[in-house]
């Protein structure tokens, strides 16, 4: 090899190495963009900020018996929402808009809409609400995923309006984490009147104002509705224990609220039961007081059609042991049963 060839080799090798490094960096950036960033880009136009004004009654101790002396206290609340139709149907959490006297929706492009409260439909039991706004231009709707196909450890992204930042700056906040657990159940919450069952747990940071915003996977598909956090005693912010309602349930409730304005849970099995106390147990020569005794079955009812007869003892409902009337009510609530659903006795 002559001197010219040696010089060319010495020059070309660093250049080639530099090109490989640059190309690797570009590819790395491309890979990063194709997962997290591109997923956010697919969804962010469908996320809205919600500003709620609530007028609540405030009593003073020495006036507690005189309604005429109650004053009105104005409270402002922030939340997030997700567009589910081009013509302006938005889903959020019920607790975000509870007791609202005014609701304002802000879209990704900075447009603000005041909501007609007659166009708000709620299901307190599932903590889901649907809002309709009147829009001139079509809104962007996201791709919906399948919350039944999720796996623990899967990467997820939370989008929303924490602490009202979106309302203030027109910029959504994104946080990333994994699915920490699936099918997490908290049962019926008496204070809120809502049931939180089969929740998605994630460590993607969720804070005040994120409620009602989407949880999405790295395909840019919505898999849940961010709902609440469990915080330490000294904090109201996220400590990595965050929970979302599975999107399959959200879509089911959304469809009922949009089409009918309510979720129909006014059903009647036609079965009347009573608890079995010690006296009744001895009279019937039973071995325990477990279960409910059937004392009447209405004609042509679903109970009669199922073959239930007077004198039967119901020991389980939907595979849950029954000992009191409250147990039956708890199963109906926690299973989020609607008219037309089946009960297994």
Which role fits each region the language model picked out?
Residues 85-167, 251, 322-323:
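Conserved active-site neighborhood of the chymotrypsin/trypsin-like protease fold
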Residues 80, 86, 99, 146, ...:
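Short, flexible surface segments
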Residues 45-51, 81, 88-92, 117, ...:
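Terminal peptide-recognition signature
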Residues 73, 77-81, 141-146, 199-216, ...:
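Gly/Ser-rich catalytic serine loop of serine hydrolases
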Residues 100-102, 139, 159-176, 185-212, ...:
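Active-site loop architecture of trypsin-fold serine endopeptidases
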Residues 27-90, 96-104, 109-114, 125, ...:
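Glycine-biased strand-turn-strand hairpin within the trypsin-fold
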Residues 1-29, 38, 118-119, 151, ...:
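C-terminal recognition in membrane/secretory proteostasis and scaffolding
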Residues 59-74, 120-127, 168-170, 182-200, ...:
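Gly/Ser-enriched beta-turn/beta-hairpin loop segments
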């Amino acid at each position: 090899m002559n001197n010219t060839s040696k010089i060319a080799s010495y020059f070309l090798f660093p250049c080639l190495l530099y090109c490989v490094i640059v190309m690797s960096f570009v590819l790395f950036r491309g890979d990063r963009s194709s997962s997290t960033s591109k997923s956010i880009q697919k969804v962010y136009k469908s996320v809205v900020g919600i500003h709620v004004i609530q007028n609540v009654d405030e009593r003073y101790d020495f006036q507690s018996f005189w309604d005429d002396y109650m004053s009105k206290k104005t409270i402002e609340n922030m939340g997030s929402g997700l567009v589910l139709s081009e013509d302006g149907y938005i889903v959020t959490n019920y607790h975000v808009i509870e007791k609202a006297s005014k609701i304002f929706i802000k879209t990704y492009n900075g447009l603000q809409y005041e909501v007609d409260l007659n166009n708000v439909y709620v299901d307190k039991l599932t903590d889901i609400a649907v809002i309709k706004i009147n829009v001139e231009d079509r809104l962007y709707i996201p791709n919906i995923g399948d919350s039944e196909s999720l796996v623990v450890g899967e990467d997820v992204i939370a989008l929303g309006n924490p602490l009202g930042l979106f309302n203030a700056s027109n910029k959504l906040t994104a946080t990333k984490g994994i699915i920490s657990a699936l099918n997490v159940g908290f049962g019926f919450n008496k204070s809120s009147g809502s049931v939180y069952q089969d929740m998605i747990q994630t460590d993607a940071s969720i804070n005040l104002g994120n409620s009602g915003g989407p949880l999405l996977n790295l395909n840019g598909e919505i898999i849940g509705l961010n709902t609440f956090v469990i915080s330490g005693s000294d904090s109201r912010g996220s400590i990595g224990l965050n929970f979302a309602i599975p999107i399959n349930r959200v879509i089911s409730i959304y469809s009922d609220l949009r089409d009918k304005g309510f979720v129909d849970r006014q059903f009647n099995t036609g079965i009347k039961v009573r608890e079995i106390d010690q006296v009744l147990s001895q009279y019937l020569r039973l071995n325990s007081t477990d279960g409910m005794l059937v004392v009447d079955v209405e004609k042509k009812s679903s109970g009669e059609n199922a073959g239930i007869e007077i004198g039967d003892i119901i020991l389980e409902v939907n595979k849950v042991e029954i000992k009191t009337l409250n147990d039956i009510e708890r199963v109906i609530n926690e299973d989020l049963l609607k008219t037309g659903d089946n009960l297994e006795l």
